[in-house]
Amino acid sequence: SVNLWYSLPSNLIINLLTNVLIGLVSFILGSWFIYIVNDYIDRNADKNHPEKSNKPIASNKIPQKLIMLVSAIILISSVSFGLITSSSFIFILCIYISSMTLYSLIIKKVFLVDIISIAIGYMLRVYGGAIIVVNSIDETINVSIWLILCTGFASLFVLSIKRFSEITNDKLT
């Protein structure tokens, strides 16, 4: 039931909310790591862009050694927080970080595969959160496939509109 948590004892509710918060922080740190990696990979191309050239990494405002150190600390922190929750969550988190890093390195250059990859990233985030909830309450509960599919199709819809808008705007300029 959707409102199953209302009937739980207070210590289980606190455990659930704590695990959800830890998972949230873990995914935030993982996403932050990926953004840094992506900016680092794109730094040379961003230097020539009128807006992106002002980014700290593209404009060389941050030394490369510091970028590497901070990104390593963020990645280790993300995985460390994930380890607190459950093995199934850390598995999802590692797949997410790996696939989004692969996106930054290769996939973003492949038409349509790039938006599918981003949509899968959103699905992994939702699935990771659902895994935390299930593991905190009752491991016999199954995560709804509809939750994952609706997230995937909704993100594909939004990403397709964004892509169409980018293509249309590029043709106008």
Q: Each PLM stretch: what is its role?
A:
Residues 2, 6-41, 88-103:
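Membrane-embedded alpha-helical segments that form the functional core of polytopic membrane enzymes
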Residues 27-58, 113, 161-168:
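Acidic (Asp/Glu-rich) catalytic motifs at the cytosolic membrane interface
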